[in-house]
Amino acid sequence: MLIVIDASRLERKRKEAIKSRTVHNRHHYFEGVAQARFVLRKVFRLIEEQAKLGGLDPLEHQVLIQIYGSPQMKLRVKEVAEKLDIAPAFASNMLKSLEEKGFVLRLASERDQRVNYAVVTVQGKQLLHRIDEQVQVHVDYFTRQLTQDAREAAISIVMFYFGISLNAGKVTHA
């Protein structure tokens, strides 16, 4: 289902959020923040539920996503830790668990045998695809329930956080 959003309305809401953040009564700003956090939290919870149904801890699911979604489709333990903002030792333990489940392989670097990379196995990719398909069903249902105002409020706050502005149909960094 494709939902079309009026870019000029969205940009107006983003500007209103910025302005309302600078006044004494910031209710309008926090209204947008609340909506954005509600939408993001709900979507993340839906993703976590599907990961659990797929037999993964939600953080293990994130590990697989980060590895598979990286440009080279491989990451070192240190990089996994950075991407998830966790300790390298914890990242190493999660990779070991995923390796035992058959979802990750650890391979030595061709250039430096001391460096190991984690790669997602075919089985791991298939699991990610299945989880994603189920997530999409649930997210589509959830987002269809949102009003246009709620959707625009959430998007405008995310745009504000990322410093993005809509200008004559083109996205620019504010």
Where do the language-model regions lie?
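N-terminal leader segment of winged-helix/HTH proteins
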Residues: 1-54, 101-103
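Solvent-exposed, charged/polar functional surfaces in cytosolic regulatory/catalytic domains
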Residues: 42-50, 83, 126, 130, ...
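N-terminal helix-turn-helix DNA-binding core of bacterial DNA-binding proteins
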Residues: 45-87
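Short, hydrophobic-biased segments on the C-terminal half of alpha helices
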Residues: 77, 95-96
